[in-house]
Amino acid sequence: MATSHLLAAASSTAASSATFRPPLLSLRSPPPSSLRLNRRRHFQVVRAAETDKETKANAPEKAPAGGSSFNQLLGIKGAKQENDIWKIRLQLTKPVTWPPLVWGVLCGAAASGNFHWTVEDVAKSIVCMIMSGPCLTGYTQTINDWYDRDIDAINEPYRPIPSGAISENEVITQIWALLLAGLGLGALLDVWAGHDFPIIFYLAVGGSLLSYIYSAPPLKLKQNGWIGNFALGASYIGLPWWAGQALFGTLTPDIVVLTSLYSIAGLGIAIVNDFKSVEGDRALGLQSLPVAFGMETAKWICVGAIDITQLSVAGYLFSSGKPYYALALLGLTIPQVVFQFQYFLKDPVKYDVKYQASAQPFFVLGLLVTALATSH
């Protein structure tokens, strides 16, 4: 639930190119596809065009030479242009953004203290992971691309939607199919777990709504760097954790507070992905933190959110009488700081992939340490 997450309504970092759009009834209306300047105002606004022909006309027919089929399947930059509609559909869901949601479910199950390595519990967790990852994160990423066509037309104009590789009806069908599948699995898990109150279903609904308003006007949370990135962090960390814990145990207020705090670290991780989109964000008037504060200040906001959050959680664990877990989390935070100075703070655009590949394994292990600590 990612959103992202869960429920996606998740994340992403998630990956080096991933991200999360007015009420679902408005999905039939074409998304913004042209950028116009309002001469009576001093700022840029995005207005919906009557058709998507302008974007398609300006988009190159082919992706850059040397594109990778593997990147295409993962939904990241450097993808090879594909004609197979199912590969294109998969690309829109950005599978590279699913693992954080899957990991969040795992952490929630561990934090419940009631997960057992039985066939039934493993099956429940797998269904919850499918709901959170492929279904609801896939929904989140597809609807994000749908409403993000103008940015993609600037940053990656050869992506499936701005290039016209997939039709409007096909995109809308995919959005609805993934959303309904995710909500259906949420309802199934509530019945399977014997819940009197359908908490997982409502988490799925909440995550899906969060994903929607993240990218879609009139709210379009992503226009605000603080609110948008926190929503992204909550979707990729808090929501899947809550779903996993609710599936096997009880979702308590202290866990909600702790995971919400961890979502601040998710905010920092989300900022990492904003640096490479500065040109498109600035052109469309999106106030990402690198645009609003400048690259140098945004770098320190990013690492500060990640590091201070983990140190705060370690302090909480220590004060709760769990010093060994606190020391383990502290030990996992130190390598992240080292990689921040080695890669990210030097050049967040050039080294973003190296930094995330090096530092994020320690971050996600820290999540598991925290989950295990709260289960005892």
Curated annotation (Swiss-Prot):
GO annotation, cellular component aspect: chloroplast membrane
Parts of the chain that traverse the membrane: 95-115, 171-191, 197-217, 230-250, 255-275, 300-320, 325-345, 355-375
Its biological purpose: Involved in one of the last steps of the biosynthesis of chlorophyll a.
Keyword annotations from UniProtKB, A to Z: Chlorophyll biosynthesis, Chloroplast, Membrane, Plastid, Transferase, Transit peptide, Transmembrane, Transmembrane helix
Localisation per UniProt entry: Plastid, Chloroplast membrane
Presequence extent in this chain: 1-47
Source superkingdom: Eukaryota
UniProt topology in membrane: Multi-pass membrane protein
One MF annotation (Gene Ontology) recorded for this entry: chlorophyll synthetase activity
Swiss-Prot/TrEMBL GO biological process terms: chlorophyll biosynthetic process
Catalytic activity field: phytyl diphosphate + chlorophyllide a + H(+) = chlorophyll a + diphosphate
Provenance organism: Oryza sativa subsp. japonica
Enzyme Commission identifier(s): 2.5.1.62
Primary residence: plastid
Chain spans, region Disordered: 48-69
Pfam family for this entry, one: UbiA
Gene: CHLG
Protein name: Chlorophyll synthase, chloroplastic
Family from the record: Belongs to the UbiA prenyltransferase family. Chlorophyll synthase subfamily.
Lineage: Eukaryota, Viridiplantae, Streptophyta, Embryophyta, Tracheophyta
